[in-house]
């Protein structure tokens, strides 16, 4: 481990992956910039990254380094309910602690590069924006999943197809992560993890780059009469606020030379916050037959398909016959207009349905609006657990 102190942040810092192929270069000169190479070939040109405080102050531009520390990571991570029981995570890491009470970590693995900002001072901090202007080149092909809400782009279900487009020809609207860019020698996928008290990242194509955008902090909430779902009615002019020390989300740029490597990349899991709930033995993962997927439409049956006992009984039979561990009761099993999850509709005959599912060794998952269950979390979980959910 090498530690140095009180350096002016003008010199570039380089971090290289354990296999020596991937490297990240960080500069804290006029602006804070990060670039990425694979075997010496540029994947991402120098790209500005920063946090913006009140009055537009940039935390990392021309910042002075109080301490730089290099270290290597080599740890076995237990991964219950992952595609493997455990995996080994290796990385080389640079940790820069600044004189202004902030810091920055950059690490390189054989699977890509990641960075995160952090704060060491203990006062109240308001983040007005985060800068992430990733320069890949105007002609680079990107796969973007755009927001489906034109009126309120950041309020949507994060469900869309991916559009293949040159960055310079992309639509002028935000896309949600993951986003993948073809950089010729390899593909780079933008990801994030360990997001606590902070908005998720969107990106918008901007010439030759993908520029991050973030939802502003809610100022005033309201409820839709239908569903009882809360929504943001008015926002602040900042994106996050917190007290004391804080670690900001990891920004991950996963590097893959073969598309089959994409779903095997472990960086999101490895850099996520460690398990805080203790034992996970009570969690039973599994596949599910999902009513919403085909809108309850069943053909060739001798009953009226819909949100009712016979339909879900049919789903249970299907799940049992095909080795699926669960069925989902999506929206409609309780009256959405009343937004009371303690009162299932009579047509579902939930107690009978649970009994039938238990006989078939199929579990039931109940879908709800997020804030509706939050408001009765302990009561609802206790009630339905006692029923056999």
Predicted regions and their residues:
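Short, low-complexity intrinsically disordered segments
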Residues: 141, 224, 248, 280, ...
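Compositionally biased regions
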Residues: 5-6, 18, 359
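Substrate-binding cleft of carbohydrate-active enzyme catalytic domains
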Residues: 285-389
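Bacterial Sec-dependent N-terminal signal peptides
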Residues: 1-12
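N-terminal accessory beta-strand-rich subdomains and adjacent acidic, glycine-rich linkers
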Residues: 11-270, 275
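An acidic-aromatic substrate-binding cleft motif
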Residues: 239, 243-318, 322
